[in-house]
Swiss-Prot record:
Keyword Amino-acid biosynthesis: yes
EC numbers for this chain: 4.3.2.1
Native source species: Pseudomonas paraeruginosa (strain DSM 24068 / PA7)
Protein name from the UniProt record: Argininosuccinate lyase
A GO MF term: argininosuccinate lyase activity
Length: 464
């Protein structure tokens, strides 16, 4: 039987080349080449460790390290020839290394498999991505604090069911988003801890017979811990799923914020104005100024939710250890990280530039009987049970709807028709300022509480 040499580095067992379509179908280099820097970083650490344990000579290590550094320079200069027939980022770099330094390049993979190599690359890459995303969250939170401080006294309607509920300050509303982003930050920090565990040394699935010292590569690569089981090390993608879950929550928060910004910029609300640089126009309607940034972020949240669902579905049927299915982990992970990072960047740039229309907000807060709860609380302080007060104020509101008057616009005689406990001091309660100032406790909407919350927020950010 004649044997035709295969076209792969693993071709010894095979008698014919991989089908051309199959080679393209199974190749991942088009998307995993973005891991090149982390792949080279891992390879340099691996070669350094192999030299320390005597598997490589110092001269071989130096040749490998120098060759890898030159390859990185080629890639970053745009002169590297990525080949689909070499499947992935790992084999492209290894083949080029062998071209550059000869047979020594073939020794780099000693004691290592692409299974633990790619698991290491992804963790190194995601670790850096999380750091970048955390910095963007902090930048957005700083912008929210600055705007909240400037608008601590600006009164707007607070909503439930998108109906006017109670007056709040715009600063207080903005700080709600600060709190949500704080939880996102904490989740990603926690995720970072589990990302930062080293699988390198797990080899294909069972470890290696070479006298490796994983502590060396762990220290060189800055991992916090070494993975304790080689089977789990090569097959675990929990960290990617966890990141996409945290990213989904963050994008959900940005999507909710986006929805409010879209509403607030509309002609029906007109609460805020976004600078032109964050908006676009219409190809047919000359008057249009569309809030495309928040609209697009709202839409992009679905991509990240899809990445989470995709990874969960990808992993749910896999037996131990590594399976080719896991090649499909990268594109959703990459896309989720890119989408979250860019969405945060867009918001961090845009939020400090928001221009509130204070008088429009205030006028909106005056409508819809927003101080009705304050009137009920006033009657409670007069000694009436809250449920009775609730009913009394409900009757007053109905009268206001029928007569076209807000509670604060009614005369004392009109108000006393509903309870003789109402005196002239009620009008201090029914003002917008009286309503927000009365909620003077930690987490409340009173302007001084908003300023205190801003101070606490800045202290928190300074400690990061």
């Amino acid at each position: 039987m004649s044997v035709e040499k295969t076209n792969q580095s693993w071709g010894g067992r095979f008698s014919e080349p991989v089908d051309a379509f199959v080679a393209r179908f199974t190749a991942s280099v088009d998307f995993d080449k973005r891991l090149y820097r982390h792949d080279i970083m891992g390879s340099i650490a691996h070669a350094t460790m192999l030299a320390k344990v005597g598997v490589l000579s110092d001269a071989e290590r130096d040749a490998i390290v120098d060759g890898l550094q030159q390859i990185q320079a080629e890639i970053e200069a745009g002169s590297f020839d990525w080949r689909v027939d070499l499947e992935d980022v790992h084999m492209n770099i290894e083949a080029r290394l062998t071209d550059r330094i000869g047979v020594t390049g073939k020794k780099l993979h000693t004691g290592r498999s692409r299974n633990d190599q790619v698991a290491t690359d992804i963790r190194l890459w995601l670790r850096d991505e999380i750091d970048t995303i955390l910095a963007e969250i902090t930048r957005l939170q700083q912008g929210l604090l600055g705007l909240a401080e400037a608008e601590a006294d600006t009164i707007m309607p607070g909503f439930t069911h998108l109906q006017t509920a109670q007056p709040v300050t715009f600063g207080h509303h903005l700080l709600a988003w600060f709190e949500m982003l704080g939880r996102d930050y904490e989740r990603l920090v926690d995720c970072h801890r589990r990302v930062n565990r080293m699988p390198l040394g797990s080899a294909a699935l069972a470890g290696t017979t070479y006298p490796i010292q994983r502590e060396i590569t762990c220290q060189l690569l800055g991992f916090e811990a070494i993975g304790g089981n080689s089977l789990d090390g090569v097959s675990d993608r929990d960290f990617a799923i966890e990141f996409c879950a945290a990213a989904s929550l963050a994008m959900m928060h940005l999507s909710r914020f986006s929805e409010e910004l879209v509403l607030w910029t509309s002609a029906q609300f007109q609460f805020i104005d976004l600078p032109d640089r964050f908006c676009t126009g219409s190809s047919i309607m000359p008057q249009k100024k569309n809030p495309d940034v928040p609209e697009l972020v709202r839409g992009k949240s679905g991509r990240v939710f899809g990445a989470l669902t995709g990874l969960l579905t990808l992993m749910k049927g896999q037996p131990l250890a590594y399976n080719k299915d896991n090649q499909e982990d990268k594109e959703p992970l990459f896309d989720a990280a890119d989408t979250l990072r860019d969405s945060l960047r867009a918001f961090a740039d845009m939020v400090p530039a928001i221009r509130p229309r204070r008088e429009v907000m205030r006028e909106a807060a005056r409508r819809g009987f927003s101080t009705a709860t304050d009137l009920a609380d006033y009657l409670v302080r007069k000694g009436l049970p809250f449920r009775d007060c609730h009913e009394i104020v409900g009757h007053a509101v109905k009268y206001g709807v029928d007569s076209g008057k807000d509670l604060a616009e009614m005369s004392l005689d009109e108000l006393r028709r509903f309870s003789e406990q109402i005196d002239a001091d009620v009008f201090a309660v029914l003002t917008l300022e009286g309503s927000v100032n009365a909620r003077d406790h930690i987490g409340g909407t009173a302007p001084n509480q908003v300023r205190a919350a801003v101070a606490r927020g800045r202290q928190l950010l300074a400690q990061r």
